[in-house]
């Protein structure tokens, strides 16, 4: 990593790239000529290894037919568990605590159905007002399924500034009527990293189970679940982990809970040696595999095989080191080049509180995102006024960051954004 003090010059960006320990991984990814892709926090790029593993599993289907469940390089019957083992180091968990299955939202339904047991005065779920909408929809659904009113039984911690959450406020909300807590590890707009260790310890002091949505942290920051004693977690694999659109998601359950009957059981909840006995009494697996429901989506899982190989080689600590350095570099460039254009930095500046993306606020954010795309820079827009820019450690360069800020400066200086409507597209 380049340690010389920040300079806003193009030459400085090139020096940073020259000293980048991860630069060899850039050739692993398909990057479109003439485009700077800064949306890996929404959908990661395709790697050559992910492509290869997808084609390998297609070949297994072609070669083996039904026998692909137990034959070939990656037998499908054991694939979810195998990928759970490969994912476990990224969250600091044991292999048996981790499974690749379902989608983020179905996995939220699974963990809430399993851990939400309203009794006595403990009937409420604690979340926050800045979390991703799908999490809230799932929590509301699960509360209704218990015959309760979400307006009364779903507590959302308020934000003091509309961007971030105070951990003190979250802890203050851990009252005697809270039965369960689900929070984001990293806020999807501002990129704030919550202190999962502290929040877990405070929840457990009060006898409350706590879990986290890792969609914006897994593959970007290290986690230490074995040390932190988190109860459960869910995540998608198509952002920083580059598993592709609709890629199968992930689920973690602390080993101390792996004897719990899944709230949502299905055929693949079974112990492997019992599954084809076809009994009507479930013999659940004694590991995170019990929290699977139906048949694995094999072809939607396949790209993750190749992608996780890359993460094993790169190492999550090195990825975090570069991510912090390149996002800090981008923030410095923005401060130097864009101070005249009414942007507000919406993400935390402190390293320990900043995730993998930059969050800029501007009244013309939707228009600005369209102008960036027209000029070959791929950001994403988040209502009401946010521009997210994610320089991903595996495949983005400092040169790309420098160029993207210069392009943004030109868009603002020449008012290029005014040719676009200030409203989002169908998919922002």
Curated annotation (Swiss-Prot):
Q: What class of enzyme is it?
A: hydrolase
Cofactor(s) named in the record:
pyridoxal 5'-phosphate
Enzyme Commission number(s) of this protein:
3.7.1.3
Keyword Hydrolase appears in the UniProt entry: yes
Q: Which residues carry this modification: N6-(pyridoxal phosphate)lysine?
A: 239
List keywords of the entry alphabetically. Answer: Hydrolase, Pyridine nucleotide biosynthesis, Pyridoxal phosphate
**Which residues are listed for pyridoxal 5'-phosphate binding in this entry?**
104-105, 132-135, 213, 216, 238, 267, 295
Pfam families reported in the protein's UniProt record: KYNU_C (PF22580)
Subunit structure of this chain's protein: Homodimer.
State what protein this is by name. Answer: Kynureninase
Organism (species): Bacillus cereus (strain ATCC 10987 / NRS 248)
């Amino acid at each position: 990593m380049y340690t010389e003090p920040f300079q806003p010059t193009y030459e400085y960006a090139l020096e940073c790239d020259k000293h980048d320990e991860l630069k060899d991984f850039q050739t692993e990814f398909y990057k479109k000529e003439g485009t700077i892709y800064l949306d890996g926090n929404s959908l990661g790029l395709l790697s050559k290894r992910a492509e290869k593993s997808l084609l390998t599993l297609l070949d297994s289907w072609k070669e083996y037919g039904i026998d692909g469940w137990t034959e070939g390089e990656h037998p499908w019957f054991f694939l979810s568990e195998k990928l759970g083992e490969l994912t476990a180091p990224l969250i600091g968990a044991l292999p048996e605590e981790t499974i690749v299955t379902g989608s983020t939202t179905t996995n939220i339904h699974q963990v809430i159905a399993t851990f939400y047991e309203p009794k006595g005065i403990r009937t409420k779920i604690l979340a926050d007002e800045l979390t991703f909408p799908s999490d809230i929809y799932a929590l509301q659904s699960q509360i209704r399924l218990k015959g309760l009113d979400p307006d009364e039984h779903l507590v959302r911690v308020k934000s003091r500034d509309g961007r971030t959450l105070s951990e003190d406020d979250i802890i203050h909300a851990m009252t005697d009527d809270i039965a369960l807590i689900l929070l984001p590890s990293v806020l999807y707009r501002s990129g704030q990293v919550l202190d999962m260790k502290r929040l877990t310890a405070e929840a457990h002091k009060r006898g409350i189970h706590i879990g986290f949505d890792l969609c914006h942290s897994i593959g970007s920051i290290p986690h230490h679940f074995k040390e932190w004693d988190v109860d459960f977690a869910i995540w998608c694999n198509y952002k920083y982990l580059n598993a592709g659109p609709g890629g199968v998601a992930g689920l973690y359950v602390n080993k101390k809970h792996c004897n719990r009957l899944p709230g949502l059981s299905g055929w693949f909840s079974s112990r492997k040696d019992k599954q084809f006995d076809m009994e009507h009494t479930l013999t659940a697996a004694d590991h995170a595999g019990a929290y699977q429901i139906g048949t694995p989506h094999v072809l939607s899982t396949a790209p993750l095989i190749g992608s996780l190989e890359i993460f094993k080689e790169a190492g999550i600590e090195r990825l975090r080191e570069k991510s912090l350095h390149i996002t800090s570099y981008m923030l410095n460039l923005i401060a130097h080049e864009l101070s005249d254009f009414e942007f507000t930095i919406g993400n935390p500046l402190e390293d320990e509180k900043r995730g993998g993306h930059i969050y800029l606020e501007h009244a013309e954010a939707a228009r600005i995102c369209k102008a960036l795309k027209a000029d070959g820079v791929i950001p994403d827009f988040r209502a009401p006024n946010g521009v997210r820019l994610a320089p991903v450690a595996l495949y983005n360069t400092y040169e790309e960051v420098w160029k993207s800020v210069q392009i943004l400066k030109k868009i603002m200086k020449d008012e290029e954004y005014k040719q676009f409507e200030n409203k989002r597209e169908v998919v922002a």
